[in-house]
Design a protein with these regions (language model features):
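Phosphate/pyrophosphate-binding active-site loops
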Residues: 1-89
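Short acidic, hydrophobic short linear motifs in intrinsically disordered regions
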Residues: 114, 119-132
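Short alpha-helical segments that sit at the start of domains
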Residues: 83-114
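Short, amphipathic alpha-helical interaction segments positioned at domain boundaries
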Residues: 168-197
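Short, cationic-aromatic polyanion-contact patches
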Residues: 106-107, 154-178
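Basic amphipathic alpha-helical segments that dock to polyanions
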Residues: 117, 139-149, 164
Length: 197
């Protein structure tokens, strides 16, 4: 309720010449943190439901009827939480999928890198060597092994200073609000040039 009322007041004041919507939406996760809750990204829900958001905001600002904006924010929190849960479930299942796909030796640098790719889906060999506390050569070899297995893709085309991406993680994190995570995973696999899991 506080988030909805504060947001509608902020939008009514319109303190900046540009960016009020972005700043107003940025205040929500800060309010969540201040109240002791984990922050939740709800802008995706707003973008998908822009007309309802506008109507609810106008009712609060012009008629002082806050019920619509409170209901909208509640719906946004519930839907965004469910969307985040789906994203988390899809991401946390990836290391097992990758292990099956690559048949990596247990505790090898390649196997250990799988967990790091969830946390850092775009990385260099230097970053991986730091994270795993292995030599640059061991990290480079691990990334080559992961690339052959269809876990990562090298993005630069360079011979040196190469950047690797776990495209399935990137696709999941970049997917439109509400999209089935499996559709995003298929897109990531397509970028990797592989079929299925």
């Amino acid at each position: 309720v506080r988030m909805a009322v504060a947001h509608s007041h902020f939008e009514a004041v319109h303190p900046f010449s540009d960016g009020n919507g972005r700043v107003g939406r940025m205040l929500w996760p800060l309010q969540m943190l201040a109240a002791g809750h984990l922050p939740l990204y709800i802008s995706g829900y707003i973008e998908e439901n822009a007309a309802a958001y506008s109507q609810a905001l106008q009712a609060a600002q012009k008629q002082l009827d806050y019920s619509a904006i409170v209901a909208f924010v509640c719906d946004a929190v519930i839907a965004s939480s469910a969307d985040e849960d789906a994203t988390k479930a899809a991401i946390t299942s990836l290391p097992d999928t990758w292990r099956h796909r690559g048949a990596f030796r247990r505790k090898s640098s390649s196997d250990r890198a799988l967990g790091e790719l969830i946390r850092l889906p775009i990385m260099t060999a230097r970053q991986l060597s730091t994270e795993l506390r292995v030599s640059f050569q061991a990290a480079s070899t691990a990334l080559k092994s992961l690339e052959r297995a269809g876990v990562v893709r090298e993005r630069t085309g360079y011979g040196r200073n190469r950047i690797f991406a776990a495209e399935e993680v990137v696709a999941l994190l970049s997917r439109p609000f509400g999209q089935d995570p499996e559709i995003a995973l298929e897109g990531g696999r397509e970028v990797l040039g592989i079929d299925g899991a």
